[in-house]
Amino acid sequence: MARATSGRRLGGLLALLMSGLLLLGAASGSAVGDERLGPRRHMLALTNSDRTHHHRATLSFAERLAAYAKSHSEAMANQGYIYHSTGAQLREALEGYKWELGGENVGVGASLESLEDAFMASEPHRKNILRRVYDHAAVGIARADDRIWVTVIFYG
């Protein structure tokens, strides 16, 4: 699922882009990513690879914001379904950051690679990944029942 929200409009979201559950089968590659990078940074590396392929600047990792993304992924895993943060939750999480637009991709799958592939195959997710205004991202990952739950928050 993908979502974008504006820092200039406290009243709501610029876009709520819902594209359904991402329940993915197994894919090639490591289930939790390149252990040298750690799974969060590996997910960002996959996203940055897609951005580079489409002539976009790479995103910097937002470490402090990643704690919020992780807690959201853990909450989804505990509840057993994917859902977005509310606009108010995203605005609060982004408080203290310099941003004009923020977005969120959430999903669950067998591997980070399969999640990134699914995000790129989904127009709303793809738009979040490739949006030129974004220059930072935070990744939160939880594991439950042999599945990986991911929250990626973009801002710029």
Where are the regions that the model predicts?
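Functional surface patches built around histidine and acidic residues
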Residues: 2-156
